[in-house]
From Swiss-Prot:
Subunit structure: Homotrimer.
E.C. designation(s): 4.1.1.84
InterPro entries: Macrophage_inhib_fac, Tautomerase/MIF_sf
Listed name of the protein: D-dopachrome decarboxylase-B
Positions of modified residues (N-acetylproline): 2
Catalytic activity annotation: D-dopachrome + H(+) = 5,6-dihydroxyindole + CO2
Record key words, sorted: Acetylation, Cytoplasm, Lyase, Melanin biosynthesis
Protein function: Tautomerization of D-dopachrome with decarboxylation to give 5,6-dihydroxyindole (DHI).
Subcellular location: Cytoplasm
GO-annotated cellular components: cytoplasm; extracellular space
Stated family: Belongs to the MIF family.
Top EC category: lyase
Amino acid sequence: MPFVELDTNLQQQEVPQDLAEKLCSATATILGKPRERVNVTVRTGVSMVVGGSSAPCTQLIISSIGVVGTAEQNKEHSAKFFNFLTEQLGLAQDRILLRFVPLEPWQIGKNGTVMTFL
């Protein structure tokens, strides 16, 4: 059950209207998870500084069970997420940051329990 959070200082009108849907589909493909299990949040107009500059930028946090736990996995995922974000947002790669957060099943609650028991 991946959780993907995109923060950007771009304004709402500067990002594709269907960015959350596209990011959901891209995440499912990149991580090899069913689209129905992907959770996406997109926040625009956020006050952000990357590399000492408030020029247009974005940060993507990818949290998931089992598929973001190694450098090798994340290197492959990183290239694909960077391609998606540069294409969708028109940002240079040096204005994009990714953060991979491995999760354990007991850290995600759903249906009154945690994923460990589902």
